[in-house]
């Protein structure tokens, strides 16, 4: 194949539904993840631009009902909002735990990073790209780098 566009419409990327193809879903893979958390003062010894964690939200769901993912996202966002006083409008970047590509902008809408019902338009216009005004999953998300279960 000569281009990525050619691959997108090839037999290697089958149509799953009317608008979705195989590559639009997370891919299972082997891997691991790590994060180093330390006091801000110590972080400056290693970088001029440390990432400061202002708040964390967490929610578990029963996996048998796919709609539960929506409630988990909303609950975790509510926790962060209460802890920090910040909203999605205050964020510079949004990283979504995506199981399929469309869940990126749906999660961003739930967390007030994008206006409700307009995520598809932001996506279509390229505004959620790494160089857009509302970037989402600049690392590619799990649909691109894979899902090493438990490491995301």
Q: Where are these predicted regions, by residue range?
A:
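Conserved active-site "lid/cap" helical segment
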Residues: 1, 19, 76-92, 103
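Condensing-enzyme catalytic core mediating Claisen C-C bond formation in acyl metabolism
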Residues: 14-79, 125-139, 143-144
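Glycine-rich, mobile lid/loop segments that gate access to catalytic sites or pores
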Residues: 1-20
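Short, catalytically relevant binding-site loops at active-site mouths
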Residues: 59-60, 73, 87, 98-102
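Hydrophobic alpha-helical bundle architecture
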Residues: 85-94, 137-146
